[in-house]
Amino acid sequence: MIPPADSLLKYDTPVLVSRNTEKRSPTARPLKVTIQQPGPSSTSPQPPKAKLPSTSCVPDPTKQAEEILNAILPPREWVEDTQLWIQQVSSTPSTRMDVVHLQEQLDLKLQQRQARETGICPVRRELYSQCFDELIREVTINCAERGLLLLRVRDEIHMTIAAYQTLYESSVAFGMRKALQAEQGKSDMERKITELETEKRDLERQVNEQKAKCEATEKRESERRQVEEKKHNEEIQFLKRTNQQLKAQLEGIIAPKK
């Protein structure tokens, strides 16, 4: 791990922790650590041992506030050059100037990291979360109850954001499915259009062939009709001439008898 980046949440000075990380229980609390000097032959004095709790039942307000702070805002740990460091949230009360400085730092970091003012912006969300954690820290030091209420507000906000993120991811997945379906439907429609255009050209070719056949048939029938009409006219003329001849012969036979 690398050292954590600068945060709007105020922390105490980092403490070098020496312990066997391989045998550490995964459920061990990072707060209960023993600070030791490297090397057994060091002449520096050993840190004082933790005092046993007094027999009095009255809890220490400062210790209680620190425990609440550590529960709300856990300490952060990192490894640097095979050395484990731990940094707890500061329990120093904040002044009005600290609040003003927090606002200035927030505005400055928003500008430096080029956070977007509108829309979805992970940078803006991260900085606002750090600022809100710092406000929770300041309020918790003065009043633990209000700090716990703000913690509930923060958790509700995180749950709401997580729900919106899940909804957004589901919407994106749904949109992608619909886009793929539309693309598939578009491909099917394009293929169907191509088939219909091919069928249309085939039908047009058949229509043209039938038109050509029809025109040829009409021309042939027209020629045949003309030939038949000419033949019929010749037969009519022949029959008329024959009729005139027979009529003349009949009149020639009948006329002398009178």
UniProtKB/Swiss-Prot annotation:
Tissue specificity as recorded in UniProt: Predominantly expressed in the testis, also detected at lower levels in several tissues expressing cilia. Strongly expressed in elongating spermatid cells (at protein level).
Keyword Coiled coil part of the UniProt annotation: yes
Top-level taxon of the source organism: Eukaryota
Sample GO molecular function, one term: dynein heavy chain binding
InterPro entries with a match to the protein in the record: Axonemal_dynein_light_chain
Main location: other
Gene disruption: observed consequences: CRISPR-mediated knockout results in loss of sperm motility and fibrous sheath abnormalities with asymmetrical distribution of flagellar proteins in a majority of sperm. Nearly half of the knockout mice develop enlarged heads and hydrocephaly.
Coiled coil residues, start to end: 176-255
Cellular compartment(s): Cell projection, Cilium; Cell projection, Cilium, Flagellum; Dynein axonemal particle; Cytoplasm
Record keyword Coiled coil present: yes
GO process annotations (BP): cilium movement; sperm flagellum assembly
Gene Ontology CC annotations of this record: 9+2 motile cilium; axoneme; ciliary base; cilium; cytoplasm; dynein axonemal particle; dynein complex; filopodium
Disordered: annotated segments: 1-60, 202-231
Keywords assigned: Cell projection, Cilium, Coiled coil, Cytoplasm, Dynein, Flagellum, Motor protein
Functional summary from the UniProt entry: Involved in sperm flagellum assembly.
Assembly, per entry: Interacts with CFAP45. Interacts with DYNC1H1.
Family in the record: Belongs to the inner dynein arm light chain family.
Protein name: Axonemal dynein light intermediate polypeptide 1
Origin organism lineage: Eukaryota, Metazoa, Chordata, Craniata, Vertebrata
